[in-house]
Design a protein with these regions (language model features):
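A short beta-loop-alpha structural element at the N-terminal edge
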Residues: 1-16
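Active-site rim helix/loop that mediates acceptor-substrate recognition in acyltransferases
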Residues: 25-56, 67
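Short hydrophobic/aromatic beta-strand or adjacent loop that forms the aromatic wall/cage
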Residues: 50, 143-147
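Conserved beta-strand in the GNAT
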Residues: 52-54, 61-71, 79-81, 86
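Conserved hydrophobic beta-strand within the GNAT/NAT acetyltransferase core sheet
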Residues: 85, 116-118
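Conserved acetyl-CoA pyrophosphate-binding loop and the N-cap/start of the following alpha-helix
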Residues: 91-103
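Conserved active-site alpha-helix within GNAT-family acetyltransferase domains
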Residues: 110, 114, 121-144
Length: 152
């Protein structure tokens, strides 16, 4: 597996946007698939936030994605955020999500951020195994979320 910035594989933007919209679109009222795709395409970068990373298998096929973002949790002033970690069901259990998380942590560290935040509806155990600390639970747009952080 190889992890690269999405800016190096722009042909994958549509799939990354579709995964994100299908998984978390309900948490972003007013956002459409088109607007999500356009936002990703317009802000792709490898050296400043936002950074979208993609995981590729040995054949070069897309098997996951994760992002480093500002302002991922509306109303929360902490930054930056590990966000949009997604691996399709058929690719799970191979360490892809963990590798993506570590790659985003490395990107944040490289950019000089001392701490990283995330929120999750269902993967707190995964993040806990990777050294993330639970900060708070709250309701967010109809979902129960866990906010976590990790010192880099």
């Amino acid at each position: 597996m190889k992890i690269v910035p999405l800016v190096e594989r722009p042909e994958l933007v549509d799939q990354v946007a579709a995964w994100g919209f299908a998984e978390w679109g309900h948490l972003n009222p007013g956002q459409t698939l088109h607007s999500r795709t356009a936002r990703i395409r317009e802000t792709m970068d490898a050296d400043r936030v936002p950074i979208v990373l993609v995981a590729l298998d040995d054949a070069g096929l897309l098997v996951g994605t994760a992002s480093l973002l500002f302002d991922d949790l509306e109303g929360d002033t902490r930054n930056p955020w590990l966000a949009s970690v997604f691996v399709p069901a058929g690719q799970r259990g191979k360490g892809t999500a963990s590798a993506l998380v570590v790659a985003v942590e490395d990107a944040a560290r490289r950019l000089g951020y001392p701490i990283l935040y995330l929120f999750t509806t269902s993967a707190a155990r995964l993040y806990g195994r990777l050294g993330w600390r639970a900060l708070e639970r709250r309701d967010y747009r109809g979902e129960h979320i866990q906010v976590m952080d990790k010192a880099l």
